[in-house]
Every structure is written in C-alpha cells, then in structure tokens.
Design a protein with these regions (language model features):
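Conserved small/polar residues in nucleotide/adenosyl-binding loops
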Residues: 204-211
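Short helix-terminating capping/connector loops at secondary-structure junctions
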Residues: 102-105, 187-191
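Amphipathic alpha-helical segments in well-structured domains
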Residues: 125-129, 170-173, 177, 203
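Short, solvent-exposed turn/loop segments enriched in Gly/Ser/Thr/Pro and often Arg
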Residues: 145-148, 197-201
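Non-catalytic accessory segments of hydrolases
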Residues: 1-167
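Alpha/beta-hydrolase active-site loop
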Residues: 164-184
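Generic structural signal for alpha-helix termini and adjacent loop/cap motifs
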Residues: 99, 182-183, 187
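Alpha/beta-hydrolase fold nucleophile elbow
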Residues: 189-199
Length: 211
C-alpha cells in the first residue's frame, strides 16, 4: 500500500482507511491559501514544504452561509454541519487509493461537489471515496471557493483581473484538476485515464475541461 508519497511540493503521509487496503490522503494542498493578497485572485502556486506533511484530517471547508434545516429536501441536503470548520484557506483535495505502488497506473475519478455555487464541501459522507477505491479506482475530491469568495462579481475585481472575472471558484476547480494530472502518478493513478464527474451545478465542469 502507498502510505507515503511525494508531490511536486513535498512529501505527504496518508492514513489507513476503514478498509486497510485503502489509503486516504486528506487535506493535500494544491494551491496557495487564497487569503490576504490572494483573496479574489486566481489560485496561486502552492509553496514547497520541508519534512512530511500529515494528511490524516480533512482541511477546513470554504466559508459559506448555513441555510439551516428547512422543510425542503434542498435545504436539508445542504445544511452545513456546525462542527465542520470553515476557513478562507480551503484549497485542498483528498485522495483515496488502493494502489500497491506508484507503478499501478489505476484509472482516476475527480469529483466536484455541487450546491449552486453557494454551499458544499468535499468532506460530506456521501463523497467518501473509499468504497469506489476498492474497485480499483483512485478517487480525488477537490475543494474550491464558493459563495462571495468564489463567485463575487464586482467592477473593481473585473478591472484588476479581466482574465478571471468573478470565476475564482471555477479557476480553483481547474487548478485542482491540473494538480491531479501532474501528481496523481505518485498515488498509483494514471494521468492519461482521468474521468471528471460532478453533482448538480458542477456537472458543467466536465464539459468545460479541455486537454
């Protein structure tokens, strides 16, 4: 099993999943924190780190409103657990792999959560990739900015960054996918066999992706 491996920015250590044949790498950074000077900007490259980064826990989710538990199925689905930490520093992804070595070259599924660009996060129980990883797939779930931090439209922001007007969350999704292409081989995945999937509004991502 691959319990420790390298990324382009440094070494990471995963954790044994409930099924000991699967390793989960949670909270792997794929871009610099979108805070301070990086707020409302396209995602910037992640800095290198020394030593081994412990990737046993999920990273905080993107800052978002909590719609609460109402009568509708939609509100009940997207009720944000009050115990889940939120932070602007949220550009992390999670990987589940059952590969025995980096030479396995298993097919890869990259999953994006939906939520009307307002809510959602990768640590929801239904997005846990362990079960699918048992079938020989390397599963990746990508966090991205939502709500005002991901899709705020303002003339000043458009003036400063005409190449990315109001679509910072979409650029996060693209950056996550590009990171997967560059790094997934070190988790036993095949960068030439990547399937993109999404829920609700994020179904468009698979159609928007190019070579």
């Amino acid at each position: 099993m691959i319990r420790q491996t390298k990324t382009e920015n440094g070494l990471v250590r995963g954790i044994e999943a409930a099924d000991p044949r699967i390793t989960a790498f949670r909270g792997v950074p794929f871009a610099a924190p979108p805070t301070g000077k990086n707020r409302w900007r396209a995602p910037q490259p992640c800095e290198n780190w020394e030593g081994i980064k412990d990737c046993a826990r999920f990273a905080p989710i993107s800052v978002q409103d909590t719609p609460g538990i109402g009568d509708s199925l939609y509100n009940r689905e997207w009720h944000v657990d009050q115990d889940v930490p939120m932070d602007e520093d949220c550009l992390y992804l999670n990987i589940w792999t059952g590969a025995k070595s980096v030479d396995d070259r298993r097919p890869v599924l990259v999953w994006y959560f939906g939520g009307g660009y307002q809510w959602g996060y990768t640590r929801e129980m239904e997005f846990d990739g362990e079960r699918l990883a048992r079938q020989g797939v390397v599963v990746v779930t990508v966090n991205y900015r939502v709500n005002v931090f991901g899709f705020l439209s303002h003339p000043q922001l458009t003036k400063e960054q005409p190449e990315a007007p109001s679509n910072f969350g979409s650029l996060d999704q693209k950056a996550g996918l590009e990171w997967v292409v560059r790094n997934i081989a070190n988790f036993g995945g095949d960068p030439n066999k990547i399937t993109i999937a999404g829920q609700s509004c994020l179904l468009y991502t698979s159609d928007a992706a190019d070579d």
